[in-house]
């Protein structure tokens, strides 16, 4: 079986190979152009390119596997690093390997920042402790609206929908820094920097909801929009991975800013 829990910039994966009846294999796939490296049958790190950004990762298992390597397409290799597209890394152990936990940090800045994010957000906490802390964060966020009446199904639909409003925007800040695809630089900023907003739709009602229920979050989103303007000269329409996609017409950021004010 497998379990997964997350923080904002990190995740913990628990695998149990005790009763698998075959060898234990874990694969790390780099889908687009990128690099991957394996260290000591336990650590995997690398990056893949996405539009105007790179997504870096650092992963460490709580116990070493027996063997490891990389692959290019379908060809397995014992080499400790690989680069290109369609590459990845693998770790393997005999049947009955038992339980193993991977801690994975991500970053738009570099591998070291991914490692720092992992340490800052999970530290030495056990899987269940991270899961409970994550649950508490969501309880606080969703608990700002209390529903009276309705059926269990209706309340479940409501809170599921409220949960999904947090899909956009994304806090891209990392330890007092953030990467911007607008000018392709790393900026120093101690406050949150939000990105990735499908604003041709979200300007209609999502930002109004944030203004009413999560005003501190909405203010930082608007501050981030103004920051994007300062970086490249225009307010955003649909910014993705830290750059403008030029997908939609109009100026949806203007009513968002006015509504927030």
Task: Identify the residue ranges that each predicted region occupies.
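Beta-sandwich/jelly-roll carbohydrate-recognition scaffolds of carbohydrate-active enzymes
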Residues: 1-194, 227
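Aromatic-rich carbohydrate-recognition surfaces in CAZymes
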Residues: 195-261
